[in-house]
Amino acid sequence: MIAAQAKLVYQLNKYYTERCQARKAAIAKTIREVCKVVSDVLKEVEVQEPRFISSLSEIDARYEGLEVISPTEFEVVLYLNQMGVFNFVDDGSLPGCAVLKLSDGRKRSMSLWVEFITASGYLSARKIRSRFQTLVAQAVDKCSYRDVVKMIADTSEVKLRIRERYVVQITPAFKCTGIWPRSAAQWPMPHIPWPGPNRVAEVKAEGFNLLSKECYSLTGKQSSAESDAWVLQFGEAENRLLMGGCRNKCLSVLKTLRDRHLELPGQPLNNYHMKTLLLYECEKHPRETDWDESCLGDRLNGILLQLISCLQCRRCPHYFLPNLDLFQGKPHSALESAAKQTWRLAREILTNPKSLDKL
């Protein structure tokens, strides 16, 4: 048993060195290329409208606010200033979303974003995004990379296609620190010892982002309340939780396996599903010794089995917002074929670790 475990860990480490590191290097190269173009577009936006200041900056060889969706798809979060005159209202009526309401006694004119406030006093995510989209469209025509960058039409999101190969979504957002959403109040679970109180305090201080992007209800049609609402995002908090042990190595292997074998019609699975299931695995195995390098095979196996279970149940709850289902709106047939493909992959890795050489 221990010999089989050791063999799997050896093969996974080899896979990490050969496949995952190559993936990381290729993505890092793409990011540099993509960020040059995006920075140029945002610089042009800022000239037209100084309220949209580019926050895309490189710190320690990684870009602040950039999320890798897949090797050819990225999201850049553009942090906006001055949320101060608004209250954060999170009543759970729209899973995964919240609204920003003008504080009592505050005049509209005190806000930097006065023309985007609705009659009922909400700061509209949709109105801000619509204005930003117009500015980006103009900037794309003027910027020095105009030959290689195009706006993607037929969406209310701000999406650029670069060199016909890459897609970058630019999302206006507010950073919320020092508060924690009511819809995430059940975290951390009282009976689960992970993460410890110090890490919990760090994560809550880190806060979350409010993004201006489409949030669909079950019908797929947006109500006006939804289009004014902001989407909650916990990227930095999640990254902080995954520090230590073999957690990030495990995530890297999962992402590489997804990119190579689970990129399926209907796009049932993305890297965020992998990250979410890794966080649940951390709760199931709360001790740091469970995340020793020697346990990499067990942890990976546990996550793949959990993924199959979620795909079969057609439900994958968000880690911080359990009322939000990350499979919502995905075609059932796509989830079914992903479950079968994940099962084949898990069986292959477990019964024949050497197969990782070919995966």
UniProtKB/Swiss-Prot annotation:
Top-rank taxon, per record: Eukaryota
InterPro entries: Mab-21-like_nuc_Trfase, Mab-21_HhH/H2TH-like, MAB21L/cGLR
SMART domains assigned: Mab-21 (SM01265)
GO biological process, one term: eye development
Cell compartment(s), UniProt: Nucleus; Cytoplasm
GO CC annotations on file: cytoplasm; nucleus
Role noted for this protein: Required for several aspects of embryonic development including normal development of the eye.
Protein name: Protein mab-21-like 2
Species this protein is from: Homo sapiens
Name of the gene encoding the protein in the UniProt record: MAB21L2
